[in-house]
Amino acid sequence: MILVTGISGGLGGLIFRGLSGEDGLGVAGGTRSGDDAVDGLEVDGLEVVGGTRSGDGVTARRIDFDDPASLADGFRGVDVLVFVSAGYAEDDVVLARHGAVVDAAEAAGVRHVVYTSLASSGSLMTIALPHRWTEARLADASFDVTILRNGLYAEIPVGLATAAASSAAETGVFAAAFGAGRVSVVAKQDLADVAVRVAAEIQRDLAQGRRSRHAGKTYELEGVEAIGGQDIADVLSDALDRRVGYHPISLSTTRAALAGSGLEPYQIAHTISLLSNLNAGYLQARDTDLTTLLPTRPRRVRDQIVQAVEEGGYRSPSVNSRSVTTGA
């Protein structure tokens, strides 16, 4: 059986859905509450183990990293654990969570853990520390391990572009603290597709009585496409049908803006760290295993930006007025 943690989140949910479409696999999903996080999943013909906080649910096991006692039952009978990292907290909290997962997986007799880590290009970012610590902790464990070093999500620049689209349509300016740097990004769905392939192949290898072909492997899943501030401005120009220029802003200006955004202090620190690395030119990938493991061509971030902006209905004032007067 395969269990995927964090299925109420974006990546975990995509992985769980993908595995649930694989023939001949037993798949269980885990959430903090064990409630209705996976309502509507298509899992015909598969064994899907359910559980809730009260133990009488039908859709997901309760997996709460902040409640280590819940993990022993949650991991019961699991062969392959897809361990989606839980990084939305201060480092000490993340280390405690991840350590509890490793301990519980060993105690439950899990045979193979697949961990979603951070790509090498991000090793100087503040978010890298808990990932590298977890990799080291997993290396000392009794089960086999596969590390999926995920690149930064394409959804980050897509979200920035979408948030800036209205202003860019009015002013013709996209402002961001990217400097002259570019960042390699990868669509979350592409990362999920790789995780599905790896976890499914591991489960099938184990079912045939052999050690998995992925045991002991670390895969760099860096994006094949790098994007910078000028690139985003150019895509906005196409999507908005008006010229948009890129205006770099300082990290100090960005930090001040984030201070009033409602983000937690650790989130601000991680954001500034990402932008600092981007400015320094450290976030462009040199090598990637993505194209080897992905069954299709990687999704293009430029296409995602255009789609998001068009779906948002953003257009420059001149385009909107032209549409009204011509009936287009």
What is the role of each PLM region?
Residues G26-R32, G45-R53:
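Short, hydrophobic beta-strand segments that form beta-sheet elements in well-ordered domains
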Residues T52-D67:
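Rossmann-fold cofactor-recognition segment
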Residues A72, G99-V102, K188-V196, V301-V306:
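Short, amphipathic alpha-helical "lid/cap" segments that border enzyme active or binding sites
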Residues A233-A280, P317-A328:
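Terminal hydrophobic/aromatic helix or amphipathic segment near a protein terminus
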